[in-house]
Amino acid sequence: MSPEALHPTRRSFLRAGTAAALTLAAAGCGFASGDDPADAEAARTPIDVKVDGDLVYFNWADFVDPTVFEGFQKEYGVKVIQSNYDSMEGMAAKLNAGNRYDIIFPTAKWAQRLAAGGRLRGIDHSRLRGAEAVFGGYGYFADPWYDPRSEHTVPFTMYKTGIGWRRDRLGDLTGSWDDLWNAKAKGKVFVLDDRDEVLGMGALKLGLPLTTGDGGDLARVGETLHSLRPHLRGFSSDSYNNLLNGNADMTQAWSGDMAAMLAQAEDPAVFGFEVAREGAPVNSDCYAIPANAPHPGTAMLFIDYMLRPENVKKNIEYIGYPMPVRGTEDTYAALVEPFPQCLVTADDLKADLFFRNGDTRGEQARDAAWTDVKAG
């Protein structure tokens, strides 16, 4: 592989965060309630879709095609002022510190926390020209578990979790989470540095609920994961580079990162991506507008601009993640032709394997289990 082709992906920097950030009750949702009455009133007021200032943008690094930014700035005569986070906990910390952004991109469970904490503006889909291509084409997002009727969000990307591996070193796998225990890969296996993903993998392997917070279940999950430790090279969310540079023979991986890797691989046939028959977690990122956004009208224009099919196609090819906008499916299918299991299907959504927020006791139990797994 060409070393100069390597670069970090959107997920490369994701980390599990501290236990304190993850044990917050569903009611508080990890966010300090907005104390400014003006912000609370604004959150209830419909957004007037018009330019009302530059766009203050807060997202993962390198997760929108730069030419899309350029086109938006030229069309609307505004600047995109970018800031980046490297975890959802980092995003939450900035919001709790009072920083003001026009557009953010939380994952599903964090969108639920934000909305429950009164931290998001409502989004009137009727004011978005591109909304029908999303909500009319993807019924799941018309009323997702994390945001009833998508009142505060518009879906940005979706993806699932599986196993990436090097065929040139391991040959074919069996289509099971058991493959992470493959003796041929011992010492060259990574799992994601992500609490929910790793505990979830162990739970699915055992036939347990994906986000179980039951102490007995988690004890079994912990025992299973401890048996994996001799096979591990480490915990890392940089699946893309670990496979490309030969640091890993096998890794737990997000489908979007595997799709992005294909664009850099000299020979895609060297690699494989599988979804385990025991189940594949599905997740999504969302567009959301904070309650204290200084320029919500510009944010609405940006969401609508991003929903244009030509911009969706550019971004799919740039980041490797599918975007649920009708008419763009062929773009992603062509991108992942060597890895068809990267596609997120209707059956994947129906399987209901989502990382949901638990109650305080369950989240604390999961934190403790994760700490134990990481400690070895």
Which ranges hold each PLM region?
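N-terminal secretory signal peptides
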Residues: 1-9, 19-26
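Early extracytoplasmic/lumenal segment of secretory-pathway proteins
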Residues: 31, 40-113
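A structural signal for short loop-to-beta-strand junctions that line the ligand-binding cleft
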Residues: 96, 100-106, 121-162, 188
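Ligand-binding pocket segment of bilobal, Venus flytrap-like solute-binding proteins
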Residues: 112, 190-194, 198, 202, ...
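Short beta-strand->loop
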Residues: 121-132, 268-281, 290-293
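Short loop->beta-strand "edge-of-pocket" segments that line small-molecule binding or catalytic clefts
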Residues: 179-194, 206
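Mature extracytoplasmic/periplasmic domains
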Residues: 290-350
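Conserved C-terminal helix/tail region of periplasmic/extracytoplasmic solute-binding proteins
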Residues: 346-376
